[in-house]
């Protein structure tokens, strides 16, 4: 178990548990976590504190019901090519139900790039999206909030509903925010010598995330959850002769 922890800890304890069970580990997940704490293998976690809010997250029931989107900086320390002042950004979309992610690297934090990101998002996710949720950044909405941005216009063209989080309330987009913490760990270990290397590495990181077991998914991967849902829908369609959902 110790060896599996060292190898897979970056993917989370759920993946450590799945890999350990493959070698015959018989203890429960909670028992494994306790053992890791006793071995001082897991660093203490400093919890963030937020102001009180009456907001409550609701549990989605199918892929595409709500997709969270956000954008983060690619650390300048990871970029060893091009002009020293050149910045890059990662646009992230995560489906709340399956936790499947789609990533894109752009060279500007702009509404043009986020709008373009939407054009292929449903194809890359593999299903129709009902709602997209973002914060109130200028890369998504106009500062005045009176005129629709390119991002909002593109959502309407795609027949996708749009929700914005309350200002200064990052926890309302918590799933994409938490996934960005994993990305920060990823970038902290990377030094890109070329743009092509960066794109290839980020694509590999996204694939690894979508194929890594998560405790919140009952030790399944995002792709496994999506596959199982599609199979249930196909079975229901054959039984009830009606469409419940649209997949690509």
Stretches found by the model and what they are:
Residues 14, 30, 112, 195-199, ...:
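Residues in well-ordered alpha-helical elements
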Residues 68-90, 98-200, 204-208:
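RNase H-like DDE/DDD metal-dependent nuclease/strand-transfer catalytic core used by mobile genetic elements
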Residues 30, 46, 132, 165, ...:
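Residue-level detector of family-conserved "landmark" positions at structurally sensitive sites
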Residues 1-75, 149-153, 226-233:
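Basic, flexible linker segments flanking DNA-binding modules
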Residues 158-160, 181-248:
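C-terminal domain-tail junction helix/linker
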């Amino acid at each position: 178990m110790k060896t599996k922890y060292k190898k897979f800890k970056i993917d989370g304890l759920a993946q450590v548990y799945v890999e350990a069970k493959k070698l015959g580990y018989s203890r429960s997940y909670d028992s494994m976590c306790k053992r890791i704490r006793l071995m001082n293998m897991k660093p203490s976690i400093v919890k963030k504190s937020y102001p009180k809010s009456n907001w409550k997250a609701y549990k989605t029931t199918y892929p595409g019901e709500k997709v969270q989107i956000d954008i983060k900086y690619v650390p300048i320390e990871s970029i060893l090519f091009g002009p020293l002042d050149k910045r890059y950004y990662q646009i992230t979309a995560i489906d709340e139900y399956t936790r499947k992610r789609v990533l894109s690297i752009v060279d500007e934090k702009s509404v043009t790039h986020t709008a373009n990101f939407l054009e292929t998002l449903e194809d890359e996710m593999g299903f129709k999206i009902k709602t997209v949720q973002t914060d109130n950044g200028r890369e998504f909405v106009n500062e005045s909030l009176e005129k629709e941005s390119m991002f909002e216009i593109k959502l309407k063209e795609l027949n996708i509903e749009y929700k914005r989080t309350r200002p200064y309330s990052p926890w309302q987009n918590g799933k994409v925010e938490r996934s960005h913490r994993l990305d920060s760990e990823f970038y902290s270990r990377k030094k890109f010598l070329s743009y092509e290397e960066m794109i290839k590495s980020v694509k590999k990181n996204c694939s690894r995330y979508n194929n890594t077991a998560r405790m919140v998914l009952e030790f399944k991967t995002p792709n496994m959850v999506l596959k199982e849902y599609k199979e249930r829908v196909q079975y229901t369609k054959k039984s009830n002769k009606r469409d419940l959902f649209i997949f690509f």
